């Protein structure tokens, strides 16, 4: 990212970034720099985490065939609202129809209010759905030296003896999402 940081610094010092139009947030600048680095690399697959929302987030410019939504809670209430349904509606914005590609929504465990909103968005954009504990799940965990052994149910079948070098059930959740998103 260093070359992209230098471009921003040079343009800033030259006064080229102080235009009277809309200003980019630090997150938007860093996101744009990351996308430029991905294009320059190039990468085959990029895991891009949404900043705060989804609907208006800078990362939403990516034509992503897979959208992963982890469990939704009350966060950033001053920006996203104070209800789970309202927050879910904002976060559902990352599930979008992408021209020329099928969209898959990988959805983690949700309270019913959030799940209803997310599923409604998948219907609107005709996205396929994979829900935790329905289409995919961790079927078993065993403590192992240096981590844990997992048995996962994915869309493509059963995966046994998956070593995760981290301890705890909370560490197995992200692995499920990442493995499923990668397989899509």
Task: Name these PLM-found stretches.
Residues 1-62, 74, 78-81, 86:
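ATP-dependent carboxylate-amine ligase catalytic core
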